[in-house]
Amino acid sequence: MVQRGVHFFSGVPDSLLKAFCLAIGSNNGGLAHRIASNEGCAVGMAMGHYLSTRTLPVVYMQNSGLGNAINPLCSLATPDVYGIPLLLIIGWRGEVDDSGKQLHDEPQHVMQGRVTLPQLNVLDIPHIVLDGHNTPPWDDIQALLQRAHDEHRPVALVVRKNTFSSPAASANPTAESALMRREAIVAACLNVLPSHLPIVSTTGMLSRELYELREQRGEGHQRDFLTVGGMGLASQIALGLCDAQPQRKVVCLDGDGALLMHMGGLTNTAQASNLIHIVINNGAHDSVGGQPTAASRLPLAPIAAASGYGATYYAETEEALQAALQQALQAQCSQFIEVQCRVGHRSDLGRPATSPAQNRDAFMQFLNTPPQLS
């Protein structure tokens, strides 16, 4: 791609593209690379690059993020509007093999995996599927890139699992820091939060850790809504609960990457007087490879305060976190707690044994049962 004049890359990291992301992130050959807060923003940056340089930009994403990119692809980059050539590189979770059989994946990837290629067809985006066993000739890929230039349109490479070789482990200075691990932070929250409060947890490792902690503690899962997909929307789900049940406090366990993806939602959640919004900030996309987020150099609590939260806190220790939680539980306005965290998770971390539908039903029953105050 570099030989074809590609020098700009932007997107949201994906586990299937981990080696690719590592390569462009560590390249010292003059490549411009910016990790985007969401996929639509990446398309916007790619457009700006093309308008300035006339060279083909690359936007990378997991297929679950294609929805975030559809608006700028359809209303800006399409040949019907500005006609911006760009290359999408899309990790295909929930992929369908050549025989039409869908490979096993987590529930949140099933529908998106099934509709990824039809979605690109409907969007009129020419595409090629890549895999590690039957890679198309380079001439075909070159022809696709040339088509992007000639027809002034987006094109796509759809990447199956194991297309790229596994990346070498890279050192992360925050991985061995003195900060708490995320799992310990979640455990500390559970030690303080009353059992009658509902918790909405964000996408990725955090929800898996919450589930395992409930198992270890012999507690049920009915009070927790695990937001397994829809990255960045856990806080908005929590806001919906706050509005529907103003008599009870609602807790959102969020992450920095998720918060950044739809950060405009802070101006809405800040208005919920019964919300306790806890953001665990490790400055990384931990679930898909540990690539840095903008929050690695950006304090989030002041942003929350400027967005209208009634009170904000910052914690690096369990003692500071517990003190913030105790104050938040007594407050009568929206509360935002930023907890600094080291990167990393247990290698043996499991996945929920219950289905999303079972989680939904148990959570709804919990919400509609009079709370036993404790």
Regions found by a protein language model. Name each.
Residues V159, L253-D256, I280, V339:
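Active-site flanking residues adjacent to catalytic metal/cofactor-binding acidic residues
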Residues R153-V158, C333-V339:
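Active-site regions of oxyanion-processing enzymes, predominantly non-cytosolic
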Residues V339-R346, G350-P352:
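Low-complexity intrinsically disordered segments
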Residues Q142, Q146, T317-Q330:
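A short, acidic, amphipathic alpha-helical segment used as a generic capping/interface helix at domain edges
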Residues M1-N121, I125, V129-E151, V155-L239, ...:
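Thiamine diphosphate
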Residues M61-S64, R248-G265:
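DG-centered beta-turn motif at the end of beta-strands
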Residues C74, I84-L86, H262-N281:
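A short alpha/beta connector and helix-capping loop motif
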Residues I276-G310, Y314:
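A contiguous pocket-lining binding segment that forms or flanks enzyme active sites
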